[in-house]
Amino acid sequence: MIEIQSRQNAALKHLARLGRERKYRRSTGEMLCEGEKMLGEALRSGAKLKTVLVKDGWDSPLVKAAEEQGASLYSAPDALFKLASEVETPQNVIFSCEQPQWTADALDGAGQVLLLDGLQDPGNLGTILRTAEAFALGAVVLCEGCADPFSPKVVRSTMGAVFRLPCVTLPLAEAAERLHRNGLPLYATALHE
């Protein structure tokens, strides 16, 4: 495990950028996750962990499992650790992993599918993904204007569903056509103020 001693550390800066910048997440294909529960969910799902940062003095068998999987391990004192977090009171572990890659083929035979268009609030999106998994939906389609499904707030709100529930991004017309071809009826609701 490498001890981070400077705010200029490349791994620390990488994690902080993953939390702040959608373009950076997209270019690296990684997402930022926080907490021991999420680390366990990532490991159980087979997600490819890249960088794991723990607070000085904190340990868990999950950290050893991440190391065995090939993740780079770092520790940092509280003041530096907080720089990588997106929350005011960070948990004991922050990590990056590869974003799950789902293609439109995940919709074939998926059964019930939830299609979302223009859902911009990250917390709401994460909660909906978590609920969709709880109701055993086969997939979720995100259309234009939806929040980034790999932003830290969405990932945190999913409580691990982001690793298990196929989440496909498609234009609305293409998604509707594909679902129709699969024999799925489309029902719509819209908020009018």
Language-model-detected regions and their locations in the chain:
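Short, conserved catalytic or adaptor-binding loops enriched in Gly and charged residues
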Residues: 63-68, 157-161
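A short acidic, often aromatic-flanked loop/helix-cap motif at beta-alpha or helix-coil junctions
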Residues: 60, 79-84, 173-177
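RNA substrate-binding interface of SAM-dependent RNA methyltransferases
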Residues: 44, 100-102, 106-192
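Short active-site oxyanion
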Residues: 27-30, 48-52, 70-72, 139-140, ...
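Short beta-strand segments
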Residues: 33-34, 55, 96-98, 117, ...
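Boundary-proximal intrinsically disordered activation/regulatory segments immediately upstream
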Residues: 1-61, 146-147
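Glycine/small-residue-rich loop that forms an oxyanion/phosphate-binding "nest" at active or ligand-binding sites
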Residues: 66-98
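Short acidic-hydrophobic, aromatic-tinged amphipathic segments that line or gate anion-handling sites
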Residues: 3-6, 72-77, 165-175
